[in-house]
Design a protein with these regions (language model features):
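Short C-terminal domain-edge/linker segments immediately following a structured domain
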Residues: 40-44, 68-71, 115-119, 145-151, ...
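C-terminal accessory "lid"/substrate-recognition subdomains
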Residues: 153-201
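A short acidic, often aromatic-flanked loop/helix-cap motif at beta-alpha or helix-coil junctions
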Residues: 66-79, 123-124, 152, 178-185
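Nucleotide-state-sensitive switch-loop elements of NTP-binding domains
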Residues: 6-112
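Secondary-structure boundary/capping positions in well-ordered alpha/beta enzyme cores
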Residues: 33-34, 144, 171
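Short, hinge-like loop/turn segments at secondary-structure boundaries
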Residues: 56-57, 134-135, 192
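Pre-Walker A adenine-sensing motif
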Residues: 1-3
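Phosphate/Mg2+-binding loops and adjacent switch elements
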Residues: 85-168
């Protein structure tokens, strides 16, 4: 690890939501190859076209990890990163992932920077029962990225965001277009905007 406390990011989202597209964009567009990144890739996830692109980045080291009893279990780390990014297992309980990452961060003297949820809008618009899972993710999140909106009514997207505004959610809701966000630095800015105070305890 470097002398300064590395900043830790956690990305929630279901498989197929474009998490790794966004991850590549944040690293490539937000860090511009200037900082060493340790990317925790969840075991058992289906491959993504962006896996090879992430592996090709000179500043990125990749380590496999899994959740076990709300704890982080990972392969050996040989990097000294400035930024650490955990991709949460797509089928995991958001609370378990939050507990695991907080414990790992505290143990390794790191600092939580931001929690990000990538929303698969097309899936959620057709599977309302999944909203409780996304609610849990967004409860912990500073930034909510609305992705996979193809074929989704604009009113649904607007109503989705307004629903959280009515609950006084302080999170930023941003659109993803073709796997990219408008301003990666805005997403990575280590400013807490989450409803949950769990990571601040």
């Amino acid at each position: 690890m470097s002398d300064q406390a590395p900043l830790v990011y956690l990305i929630y989202g279901i498989p197929g939501s474009g998490r790794r597209d966004v991850l590549f964009d944040l690293i490539d567009g937000g860090l511009e190859g200037k900082e060493q990144v340790l990317y925790f890739h969840p075991e058992g996830e289906a491959t993504s076209p962006f896996d090879e692109q992430l592996e090709a980045l000179d500043t990125v080291s990749i380590v496999n990890w899994k959740l076990s009893d709300a704890s982080v279990v990972h392969d050996q780390i040989d990097a000294a990163p400035e930024k650490i990014i955990f991709l949460a297992p797509g089928n995991s309980d958001p609370a378990d992932a939050a507990e695991a990452i907080k414990s790992w961060t505290d143990l390794n003297n790191c600092q939580i920077a931001r929690i990000i949820t990538v929303v698969h809008c097309a899936f959620l618009s057709e599977n309302s029962a999944a909203k409780a899972w996304f609610d849990a993710c967004i409860h912990f999140s500073d930034v909510v990225l609305l992705n996979r909106r193809e074929g989704v009514n604009n009113k649904w997207v607007k109503d989705f965001e307004v629903g959280y505004r009515k609950q006084f959610s302080p999170a930023r809701f941003l659109m993803v277009k073709k796997g990219r966000v408008a301003n990666p630095l805005e997403v990575l800015e280590p400013e807490a905007r989450r409803l949950s105070l769990y990571f601040d305890e």
